[in-house]
UniProtKB/Swiss-Prot annotation:
GO annotation, biological process: isopentenyl diphosphate biosynthetic process, methylerythritol 4-phosphate pathway; terpenoid biosynthetic process
Reactions performed catalytically: 4-CDP-2-C-methyl-D-erythritol 2-phosphate = 2-C-methyl-D-erythritol 2,4-cyclic diphosphate + CMP
Pfam families registered for this protein in UniProt: YgbB (PF02542)
PROSITE patterns in UniProt: ISPF (PS01350)
Gene coding for it: ispF
Positions of a divalent metal cation binding: D12, H14, H46
Signal sequence range: none
Annotated source species: Salinispora arenicola (strain CNS-205)
Function in brief: Involved in the biosynthesis of isopentenyl diphosphate (IPP) and dimethylallyl diphosphate (DMAPP), two major building blocks of isoprenoid compounds. Catalyzes the conversion of 4-diphosphocytidyl-2-C-methyl-D-erythritol 2-phosphate (CDP-ME2P) to 2-C-methyl-D-erythritol 2,4-cyclodiphosphate (ME-CPP) with a corresponding release of cytidine 5-monophosphate (CMP).
Broadest EC class assigned to this enzyme: lyase
Subunit structure: Homotrimer.
Record keywords, A-Z: Isoprene biosynthesis, Lyase, Metal-binding
Name of the protein described by the UniProt record: 2-C-methyl-D-erythritol 2,4-cyclodiphosphate synthase
Pathway connected to this protein: Isoprenoid biosynthesis; isopentenyl diphosphate biosynthesis via DXP pathway; isopentenyl diphosphate from 1-deoxy-D-xylulose 5-phosphate: step 4/6
Length: 161
C-alpha cells in the first residue's frame, strides 16, 4: 500500500480588542488584550483548524464553525481544534503533524512555547509545533493592531479507513 500524504496551509487573522481575554496557542495570556472574534479568536488554534480541515478537503473554519452556527459562539480554540481533528479522522485520515507560526509583537510566545505545544498536541492527538515571528514593525501586526497565525498540516489516508 502506498501512503499518499495531503498537505494544506491554514491562516487566521484577528484584531486586538481591549478588555477581552487573550487566548493564543491554547493558552490564556493574563494582562494582554484579547482578539476580536466569534469564538476566542485564538489565531494559532484557528490556523491549525483551517490547515487540518483543508488537508482533508473538509472546507475551512468558517464553513465548519462559522457565525451561522451559534453553538460555536465563544468556543475555545482548543475545542475547535479538537473537533476539527475529530472530523478529519472521521473522514478517513490520520494526522501526521501540524506546524503553526504566530506573527505579531505580543504576546511573546517563546517563554511558553513548550506549554502551548503540549496543549495543542493534546487537542490534535498528534505533534503540533509552535514558532513565532515579528514583522519588524511592518503591517498591522507590526503596528500592534492584531495577530496572524499560519499553519501547515500533514494528513494521510488512515490504513484502516
Amino acid at each position: 500500500m502506498v501512503i499518499v500524504p495531503r498537505v494544506a496551509i491554514g491562516v487566521d487573522t484577528h484584531a486586538f480588542e481591549s478588555g477581552r481575554p487573550c487566548w493564543v496557542a491554547g493558552l490564556h495570556w493574563p494582562g494582554q488584550d484579547g482578539l476580536a472574534g466569534h469564538s476566542d479568536a485564538d489565531v494559532a488554534a484557528h490556523a491549525a483548524c483551517n490547515a487540518l480541515l483543508s488537508a482533508a478537503d473538509l472546507g475551512d473554519l468558517g464553513a465548519n464553525f462559522g457565525v451561522g452556527q451559534p453553538e460555536w459562539s465563544g468556543a475555545s480554540g482548543v475545542a475547535l481544534l479538537t473537533e476539527s481533528a475529530s472530523r478529519v479522522r472521521a473522514a478517513g485520515y490520520a494526522i501526521g503533524n501540524v506546524s503553526v507560526q504566530v506573527i505579531g509583537n505580543r504576546p511573546k510566545i517563546g517563554s511558553r512555547r513548550a506549554e502551548a505545544q503540549r496543549v495543542l498536541s493534546g487537542a490534535v492527538g498528534a505533534p503540533v509545533s509552535i514558532s513565532a515571528a515579528t514583522t519588524d514593525g511592518l503591517g498591522f501586526p507590526g503596528r500592534g493592531e492584531g495577530l496572524t497565525g499560519i499553519a501547515v498540516a500533514l494528513v494521510y489516508e488512515a490504513p484502516d479507513a
